[in-house]
């Protein structure tokens, strides 16, 4: 395979403005195609989507209204930007919390390189400072806030879906309104989600959990703050086998149980198999590793041979191009 180069952009925009509008204009044709892939009738009406956002995440409504304005005020963009009941997306990912010497949340994001936004956003939409990796134009794949809360997502390994929100917006919501893991769990218990996902959460006090979400089951907690791409047990065997979900979980649990492993060793394991994946042609290659440090208000983004540190107090705008060894551009094969 040929190597692929990905460019990541770090953008500071406290409130959505010209920068977001430019990203929307570049991305909207692709997002429009995704949103309508099953036909317009498969998506909720404007009234229903708005009603659900106001009912379950009202604190985000002013930001959503601003985004709709920046996007031109159209019905379709407004509906999509609620991220209520969009087409489901299947991702990879491995994530865990380690507590040596300070608690850190480490994650690998595994997905198709053609479908990654690659934008590290520093924002303050609701007044709280947040750094995170953008997805779906204003959702987040993972991130940290100025209260010291860190959250990351991993697909939960079920085909079944139902009415609810895309989880990247839920991650955004938690980081905008919550300060502690306990508060985040309280919010998750009342927000409907579209598909099965695992959220690993860590706060500044060191409280760490992996919450198992689904559209048709109550919120539950994993025995340890680790997650790959299944929940209590494997329910989509073909998918789990193809992306080595069970093997990756076992590796994370071994690392968590190792009493002498240092933080560099723990983090380094995410850059090696089985946690690091080169299955780019299948849409599940590792695109970045993120080390969230709540005590420092910082996130480090890692790739083989490269590191980019960002913090709430010293955010560096700019771009970094990284090489993914053995990667190959692929067709979109990462939807349910």
PLM region spans:
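Short, glycine/charge-rich beta-strand/loop segments that flank catalytic centers
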Residues: 76-97
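C-terminal, well-structured catalytic/ligand-binding subdomain of enzymes
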Residues: 1-75, 83, 100-336
